[in-house]
Structures are given as structure tokens and as C-alpha cells.
């Protein structure tokens, strides 16, 4: 698969999944916050501190800009290792959605698309690894570094989400 096609597929799948979260998250929390068995569910356990829909959208927009920029740069330099690393980190983030849906027996925001995108993503990643020359040392380092930086970014965004909420409500 050509690197630009791979990058395009990644960004489209990312946004479809994120739209599902944005659209359904508040309704899901409201509906399930009083159900005792759901108290540890991914979204419900953070119901008191979960950002507004507007803030969530802004946080996703920031992630979209970063992901798009990195995919563009990596594509320009034909660095499949970086493109695949971004995809793997994104695919890994789907696992908690799948786990919660299986654990609680109901779909949560993002879990529907996770069940579709996860196996598709694994197939795409596997296909690229088999058909392109990948430097596995660089690839593993990129997965670790990008994964670490994406987690830091997400933690940072959640840390400042209350400030963003206040700013957006002015």
C-alpha cells in the first residue's frame, strides 16, 4: 500500500471513531451513571470530571492536527515506520473500548467503531509490514516514543480540560 493511501486511511478511521465518541458520550454517561455495575466503565468512572462536548471536540481537533501533520511529514519522507507507529498507537487505544463493551455487555462511545477498525487495522498493519521494507529497530523505537508522547499529550489535554471548558463558556 502506498504511504499516502495508508496515511489517508489512518486519519479517516481516526475521525470516524472520534465522531462516534463525540456524538454518544454525554448521552451514554447520563444513561449509565446511576447503574451500579457500570461505575468502573471507561467513561462513567470519570463522569464528574469529563469535559464538555465542545472541549472534547477541541481536544480531538488538536489530536487531529498533530496526527495529520505527522502523517504528512512521514509520508513526504516515505517513513513507513512512523506512519505504522502512529497507526499502532491509535489501534492500541481501541483495546479499552473493546474490553469495556465485552465486560459490560453493551456498546460504549467508540466501541462500535473499535470492533470494526481494530481487526481492519491489524490486517492493514500486517500487510504493510509484509510488503514494505521496514527497519524494525526504528519501527519499535517509534512505537515506544510516539506512544509515550501521545499518552503525555492526552494526559495534558485532560489536565487542562477544565480551563478549556471555562474559556469556552465565557
Mark where each language-model region is.
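N-terminal signal-anchor transmembrane alpha helix
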Residues: 1-26
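Transmembrane alpha-helical segments that form the membrane-embedded catalytic/substrate-channel core
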Residues: 15-22, 90-101, 147-162
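Cytosolic, membrane-interface loops and tails of multi-pass inner-membrane proteins
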Residues: 21-49, 160-170
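Membrane interfacial helix-start motif at the N-side
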Residues: 23, 42-60, 100-104
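Core segments of transmembrane alpha-helices
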Residues: 55-73, 116-122
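Membrane-interface helix caps and helix-loop-helix hairpins in membrane proteins
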Residues: 76-77, 98-108, 131-133
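Hydrophobic alpha-helical membrane segments
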Residues: 88-97, 108-129, 149
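Terminal transmembrane helical module of multi-pass membrane proteins
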Residues: 122-170
Amino acid at each position: 500500500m502506498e504511504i499516502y493511501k495508508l496515511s489517508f486511511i489512518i486519519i479517516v478511521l481516526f475521525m470516524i471513531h472520534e465522531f462516534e465518541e463525540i456524538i454518544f458520550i454525554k448521552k451514554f454517561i447520563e444513561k449509565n451513571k446511576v447503574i451500579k455495575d457500570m461505575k468502573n466503565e471507561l467513561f462513567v468512572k470519570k463522569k464528574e470530571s469529563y469535559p464538555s462536548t465542545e472541549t472534547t471536540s477541541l481536544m480531538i481537533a488538536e489530536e487531529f492536527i498533530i496526527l495529520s501533520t505527522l502523517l504528512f511529514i512521514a509520508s513526504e519522507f516515505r517513513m513507513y515506520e512512523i506512519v505504522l507507529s502512529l497507526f499502532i498507537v491509535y489501534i492500541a487505544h481501541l483495546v479499552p473500548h473493546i474490553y469495556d463493551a465485552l465486560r459490560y455487555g453493551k456498546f460504549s462511545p467508540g466501541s462500535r467503531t473499535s470492533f470494526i477498525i481494530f481487526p481492519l487495522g491489524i490486517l492493514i498493519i500486517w500487510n504493510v509490514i509484509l510488503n514494505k521494507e521496514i527497519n524494525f529497530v526504528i519501527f519499535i523505537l517509534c512505537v515506544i516514543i510516539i506512544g509515550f508522547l501521545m499518552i503525555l499529550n492526552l494526559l495534558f489535554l485532560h489536565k487542562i480540560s477544565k480551563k478549556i471548558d471555562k474559556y469556552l463558556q465565557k
